[in-house]
Amino acid sequence: MQENLLEKQFLNHPLYAKIQELKALNLACNFSLDDSVNLSTNSQAKDEILTITKKLKPWRKGPFKIDDLFIDTEWQSFIKFNILKPFMGEISQKCVADIGCNNGYYMFKMLEFNPAKLIGFDPSIKYRLQFELINALAKTPIKYELLGVEDLPNYGLKFDVIFCLGVIYHRSDPIKMLKDLKAGLNKNGVVFLDTMYIEDEREIALVPNKTYSKIPNIYFVPSISALKNWCERAGFKEFEVLATKKTDENEQRKTEWIDSFSLENFLDPKDKNLTIEGYEAPKRVYIRIKI
């Protein structure tokens, strides 16, 4: 029911019609990848593309380059992708899901590793529209579902590899989320997950009072030991830490493509090792878990 409602709202969105008009032009496009997703069309639709992209702000994940238009997104998402890139060989000829896929940046980047199938899940109309704009030009076989992680167990297709990046701390029941990820896997499937974490040897999690780094929907920020316990309780047998990284103002910053504040405004101005609330500043752990 929720999916049908979101799909209806998406299809009735005025920008969807504009994107379909652009798609109908069937513009020749050279699609290439480096740190940004690059689309070269040399078309006469540049003004229309600029208008649509501006109306689709904020652009969080990226960057994207469409001809001479550079969408300088809030996150330099290639930094996260490059952390995971040494492990991307595991998606070759595999059925892959990206849970919380935002506008599809990571999925576009994954194409160079030749997955057999690539499906993104995110119940956000705005992010789906951003994806549809890029894909109207790129013409990739990526599929985008207006669904959340809770829809995985009954989706009807199981995955060899699932990416779930920057989602778990937004969930009020992280173990349930991990169980949903497990239910979406094929036998011998693998999950790549990242989360903010706290430095502590104990099996504990930070439960922010109202906000964490000015973000209201952060429920739990675990220690790595606590995260491992969550994964084991959800039924995962293998837990491997791939990397850790502190989030800095090079990776996340305010640009003209967002109309709100960013990391520099979320940290204590006197001590960048603390959030504005006095918690540890954001840092992330990247893990690979298997059943």
UniProtKB/Swiss-Prot annotation:
Keywords, comma-separated and alphabetical: Transferase, tRNA processing
Residues given in the record as carboxy-S-adenosyl-L-methionine binding sites: K61, W75, K80, G100, D122, P123, S124, V149, E150, Y169, R284
Any Pfam family hit: Methyltransf_9
GO biological processes: tRNA wobble uridine modification
Signal peptide: none
Enzyme class: transferase
GO molecular function, one term: transferase activity, transferring alkyl or aryl (other than methyl) groups
Catalytic activity: carboxy-S-adenosyl-L-methionine + 5-hydroxyuridine(34) in tRNA = 5-carboxymethoxyuridine(34) in tRNA + S-adenosyl-L-homocysteine + H(+)
E.C. designation(s): 2.5.1.-
Function recorded in the entry: Catalyzes carboxymethyl transfer from carboxy-S-adenosyl-L-methionine (Cx-SAM) to 5-hydroxyuridine (ho5U) to form 5-carboxymethoxyuridine (cmo5U) at position 34 in tRNAs.
PANTHER family: TRANS-ACONITATE 2-METHYLTRANSFERASE, TRANS-ACONITATE 2-METHYLTRANSFERASE-RELATED
Family (UniProt): Belongs to the class I-like SAM-binding methyltransferase superfamily. CmoB family.
Subunit-structure text: Homotetramer.
Protein name as annotated: tRNA U34 carboxymethyltransferase
Native organism: Campylobacter jejuni subsp. doylei (strain ATCC BAA-1458 / RM4099 / 269.97)
